[in-house]
């Protein structure tokens, strides 16, 4: 009888344990935070505990972090708003539903609440283009002047945190940093990335968020075509140029890039009369030269792009011709002919300037020589006049013929003038 009673008690005990385990695992609630479990200092966060039983009453308790006296022996209705949050709200939380006296539901999985904005934000850099081919890799670097122990890289999609990676930091004289390699690239890895810094002794207190970087994957869909609008349909405003991106695919949005870097926001696609989908991009008057490409994407996957269009080269700002790679060789020949013509013109101009300077100097030299000869003539005339002052007055006739120097002295030397003082002296000097 005693053995039968003990056997019945043990069976009942194990049956209750098994039923409790079954009920607890089936009724395990789910604890979530909105808008995110990473909460900026001073902002609000809403904690919600959901259950398959549809119960709206639950309790919270904190496993790690500073004690939160607001939770002690307090029952909440479905959701609870905390805020403005401080470092006291940081920690690990669980929730459960009180069912009846001394019987509780299973506890939820732990939920970490992180308070950000405790330290200055780090800087996030991308070491390649943010447009990554399918299967490619990309490297991100997060660095700061603060000596953080760890950095946390977080990816967002539609404003919701998808993944996070925590890596130990490397220290150096100017601060700390860490590098992340992402790839091979798939649509699941793309999104908006930010990074935070933290210290091991305060794991629930992070720095402010870095500036975001958007990483897109390309090559998922067929490439569109890109062209410059020419002729009467050219959409111009001053020196603004219009580019057209067109595709057979029913893309929602088209995007533009220059030298692998996205430019501005995407443009909505419009279906043309031919049934194709098109978007027009107006480039500012100060057009930067380079290779332009366009891509297509869908609204529900804005980080997943098509293959790039063939490059369209814009060589200069303003109203400039546009070239594709097929036109490059032809344009190079044209440019070579233009350059050759300019060089020949420059050489001719230099030669003309040289000869002009040469003849100018020659004329100047001739004028100086003529002036010098005229001055010499005046000096000689003065000397001859003075030599005859002591003699009898004689008649001297000067004749100037053209510009050749020719002296004909019909008078005797000066020493013999006195002997022929009665004769007429004819002096003829022809100067050039």
Curated annotation (Swiss-Prot):
Residues on Extracellular side: 22-335
Ranges of the Cytoplasmic topological domain: 357-432
GO cellular component, one term: plasma membrane
Principal subcellular localisation of the protein: membrane
One Pfam family here: ig
Disulfide bonding pattern of the chain: 49-95, 142-195, 245-294
Localization terms from the record: Cell membrane
Sorted UniProt keywords: Cell membrane, Disulfide bond, Glycoprotein, Immunoglobulin domain, Membrane, Receptor, Repeat, Signal, Transmembrane, Transmembrane helix
Function per UniProt: Receptor on natural killer (NK) cells. Inhibits the activity of NK cells thus preventing cell lysis.
Family assignment from sequence similarity: Belongs to the immunoglobulin superfamily.
Name listed for the protein in its UniProt record: Killer cell immunoglobulin-like receptor 3DL1
Organism of origin: Mus musculus
